[in-house]
Amino acid sequence: MNDRLFIFDTTLRDGEQSPGASMTKDEKLRIARQLEKLGVDVIEAGFAAASPGDADAIRAIAETVRNSTVCSLARANERDIHAAGGAIKPAKSGRIHTFIATSPIHMEKKLRMQPDQVVEAAVKAVKLAREYTDDVEFSAEDAVRSDMDFLVRIFDEVIKAGAKTINVPDTVGYSIPALWGERMKALIERVPGSDKVIWSTHCHNDLGMAVANSLAAVMNGARQVECTINGLGERAGNASLEEIVMAVRTRRDVFGCDTRIDATQIVPSSKLVSTITGYPVQPNKAIVGANAFAHESGIHQDGVLKHRETYEIMRAEDVGWNANRLTLGKLSGRNAFKTKLAELGIVLDSEEALNAAFARFKDLADKKREIFDEDLQALVSDEGYATEDERFKLLSMKVCSETGEVPRAQLVFTDDGAEKQASGEGSGPVDATFKALESVVHSGADLLLYSVNNITSGTDAQGEVTVRLAQDGRVVNGQGADTDIVVASAKAYLHALNKLHSKRERAHPQV
């Protein structure tokens, strides 16, 4: 059996379906570049038929990425296949991932199609996709609740039609490892021509077993795993890329395969996705959580000090953890700044953008004695928080908060280029800031989440604020970073408002 495990990352498609995690084209490009640096085999860049914006983002990634295959999702219909084919056309290596539901409940209630019609649609889609690329993947949506005989039949037919990868998804996160492994093994044994394709698995985490189910599939013959950075995804999320990769690498004696992932890029990838999407990583998250390599117990600490392998099965530095390394200071020049951005995988598209970023860096260096890698990531992201059709932008603000007095906030911001002033009172400086903004913009949005995370250590560290707003069924995340938490909060709120006013709205299907 092949000892190479292919990593199919769907952070930019399935991961983006997390509430409020929608990304701009530039944000998707930043993540795609990092995924390429990480060494993923396939980047599912989006769902081209969802919107012109999604198709444009996929096309931009296809033009940029050269060491990973760029993929677009497509339902099994002509419109979706044509949209996907056009979007991946510039790619050095492009893939179309087409799918159709195969479970009785989906065929009857959603598709309103007979099994014969479903097979016919799947075969037709694969053949049409082959007109754009030889690399076609087929997924049987809700395979976990599909009849085995029907799965064998439809997989047989799409392989004959030219599919190169067969993906078996647990769309609703219903299976358990023993049963999922058995299903994968049985399909590989029963489907004619199974040795001519790569078998893949795509597991959701509704019962907390996405990684375990994926690994069970690998142990039973799957050689592609579909996953996301930090396990990001709709509902309870997807299988975590970092956990899949390190489980297979650490226990190669069990799995008998490995990936081409550069594990030292795992933590940087995790931090970038967290920053852009506004989804913080829980401290006890395996591999990428802040406590993943922390030892509190005295017995554990003593053992680790004597010999690290007594309590550590992998090294923190192997997955990209390092101390907050001092990188630049207030005396650092423009060339040093540009070089450091390049080392971090940050690409600015013009000299004007570089000059603007350097100006923000010098401003930060005046407020903060030591500048770390994480500060630079946040600095560039803070500017990247501007949406493609930015309406609101903070110019200045003043907050008054005294013991025994009601906090007050005054802000100056632009609204479609026109300068506006706002003032308000609240139970605290952040509450006063948000009420001041609402007194002018009147969005009527509900505040679902407000969170603050320190970017680095120290009392002068930048704070990164995430705000989640809901309006008329839309949910968006806004982010802002600053050494002043209240300023960061105002930036985050305005960023969320900009997203609500943006016309970028997509609906991605489940797989």
Curated annotation (Swiss-Prot):
User: Which GO terms are recorded in the biological process aspect for this UniProt protein?
Assistant: L-leucine biosynthetic process
Cofactor requirements of the protein: Mn(2+)
Q: Where in the cell is it found?
A: Cytoplasm
Q: Which residues form the Pyruvate carboxyltransferase domain?
A: 5-267
Provide the E.C. number(s) assigned to this enzyme. Answer: 2.3.3.13
The protein's predominant localisation is cytoplasm
* An example Gene Ontology CC term for this record: cytosol
- Transferase: is it a keyword of this entry? yes
This protein is called what? 2-isopropylmalate synthase
Q: What class of enzyme is it?
A: transferase
- Top-level taxonomic group: Bacteria
Provide the residue positions that the database annotates as binding Mn(2+).
Answer: D14, H202, H204, N238
Question: Which one of the record's GO molecular function terms can you name?
Answer: 2-isopropylmalate synthase activity
Q: In which pathway does it act?
A: Amino-acid biosynthesis; L-leucine biosynthesis; L-leucine from 3-methyl-2-oxobutanoate: step 1/4
Q: Which reaction does it catalyse?
A: 3-methyl-2-oxobutanoate + acetyl-CoA + H2O = (2S)-2-isopropylmalate + CoA + H(+)
| InterPro entries from the UniProt entry | 2-IPM_HCS-like, 2-isopropylmalate_synth_dimer, AIPM/Hcit_synth_CS, Aldolase_TIM, LeuA/HCS_post-cat, LeuA_allosteric_dom_sf, LeuA_bact_synth, PYR_CT
